[in-house]
Structures are given as C-alpha cells and as structure tokens.
C-alpha cells in the first residue's frame, strides 16, 4: 500500500486576527479534522501585496489546497456544500 493514500493535501490559509470569515474558514477545516498552515498578514504589507498578487484579491481569508486557489470563506463553503472540497482533498 502506498504511504500517500492517507496523506492530507497541503492547505494554506492567509488570515488576519479580527476577521470573522477567517475564523469561519478555520472552523470549517477543523470540523473536517484538517490541518493547515496559517499565514497571518496583520501588519505585514509585504505579505498583503504578495497575497493580492497571488490571488487577485485583497480580502482575507484566502485559501489554497495543494497550490489550487480556492478563494475566501464563501468559496470554501460552496466547495464544501457541493462536494468539491472532498474531491480536492482526495486527490
């Protein structure tokens, strides 16, 4: 059996401390028992600029799963409700 069968995809989430959508996104991931790398962009204009260049958006959260840009919480929630999130996680 391959060791990669149970490997969770890499998940990165760019957040700020006082963002309720960030909290909601992290809660959704945690409900699914997923671990993620949180990148806090508070007081980090360099990271904010990088985030905007990568995502095309200046809002947080911004979420990537295995280098696939999901978007913010609204898009993550839509992926969860449609079953797309489970498909992305099973790749």
Label every model-predicted segment.
Residues 65-91:
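Non-catalytic, surface beta->alpha helical segment in thiol-disulfide oxidoreductase systems
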Residues 53-59:
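Thiol/disulfide oxidoreductase modules built on the thioredoxin-like
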Residues 35-48:
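Thiol-based oxidoreductase modules, predominantly thioredoxin-like and allied folds used
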């Amino acid at each position: 059996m391959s060791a990669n069968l149970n490997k969770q995809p890499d998940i990165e989430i760019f957040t700020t401390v006082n963002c309720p959508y960030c909290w909601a996104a992290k809660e959704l991931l945690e409900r699914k028992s997923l671990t993620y790398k949180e990148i806090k962009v508070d007081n980090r204009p360099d990271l904010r600029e990088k985030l905007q260049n990568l995502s095309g958006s200046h809002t947080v959260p911004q979420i990537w799963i295995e280098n696939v840009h999901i978007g913010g919480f609204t898009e993550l929630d839509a992926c969860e409700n449609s079953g797309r999130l489970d498909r992305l996680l099973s790749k």
